Amino acid sequence: MFDKHTHTLIAQRLDQAEKQREQIRAISLDYPEITIEDAYAVQREWVRLKIAEGRTLKGHKIGLTSKAMQASSQISEPDYGALLDDMFFHDGSDIPTDRFIVPRIEVELAFVLAKPLRGPNCTLFDVYNATDYVIPALELIDARCHNIDPETQRPRKVFDTISDNAANAGVILGGRPIKPDELDLRWISALMYRNGVIEETGVAAGVLNHPANGVAWLANKLAPYDVQLEAGQIILGGSFTRPVPARKGDTFHVDYGNMGSISCRFV
């Protein structure tokens, strides 16, 4: 595993790429011995940089929750990242496209916690007991590293994505909040419209068989670092659609049926 100085240097590179709105060479090309543990250490350093600049931690995201995405990334479990206070947008927002590099939208459910959740041995039932409400959420993902390196043509790896805050860049909350036992969360479905055309559909059971399973997984994953999910935090449970590119001028409307809808426009 690399030393802390190296983790900080990599985090600073990613931070500069985000601020300059310019993709950089994949971290794993310059640091071929990087491990998953290194990647999360880089992510923690990146979060520390942001907090030092005045940001606050508002929650966490879970990604790569489908078997297909895990297989394509050559890992056997999800990944996770941090949600900061300046990442959140309201339903109906005009989202500044120029703030991002290659923004894409995913359909998710967010769990807002009323009680702390701590692993190990956290279960789906513990998640239900700790959750205040569940609300529709769109995750705005972005990439500060090239997907395909222009020089070598090598694709980025999961180490690059994890280091890059698991590709998170924004969150749009909306729709109707519900108590976790008000509906069978597995059967919550959504239709994603971009410019009036359905681009993606999905059902929440596609996230680890149940959207609350990802929250339990995260609590258990963070336990060795003596980190718990705190009351009031927002946890994005994972996407149940493929990501859809968001371009300047695009309007998104995502219909969650009984849970309402979320709309936003990229300007």
From Swiss-Prot:
Cofactor: Mg(2+)
GO BP annotations listed: catabolic process
Pathway note: Aromatic compound metabolism; 4-hydroxyphenylacetate degradation; pyruvate and succinate semialdehyde from 4-hydroxyphenylacetate: step 6/7
Keyword Thylakoid: no
Domain of life: Bacteria
Residues bound to Mg(2+): E106, E108, E139
Any Pfam family the entry gives: FAA_hydrolase
A GO term from the CC aspect: cytoplasm
Catalytic activity line of the entry: (4Z)-2-oxohept-4-enedioate + H2O = (4S)-4-hydroxy-2-oxoheptanedioate
UniProt signal peptide: none
Cofactor notes: Binds 1 Mg(2+) ion per subunit.
Molecular-function annotations in GO: 2-oxo-hept-3-ene-1,7-dioate hydratase activity; 2-oxopent-4-enoate hydratase activity; metal ion binding
Keyword list, A-Z: Aromatic hydrocarbons catabolism, Lyase, Magnesium, Metal-binding
EC number assigned by the record: 4.2.1.163
PANTHER family: 2-KETO-4-PENTENOATE HYDRATASE, ACID HYDRATASE
Function: Transforms 2-oxo-hept-4-ene-1,7-dioate (OHED) into 4-hydroxy-2-oxoheptanedioate, a step in the 4-hydroxyphenylacetic acid (4-HPA) degradation pathway.
Subunit architecture: Homodecamer.
Family statement drawn from the similarity comment of this UniProt entry: Belongs to the hydratase/decarboxylase family.
Protein name: 2-oxo-hept-4-ene-1,7-dioate hydratase
Source species: Escherichia coli
Lineage start: Bacteria, Pseudomonadati, Pseudomonadota, Gammaproteobacteria, Enterobacterales
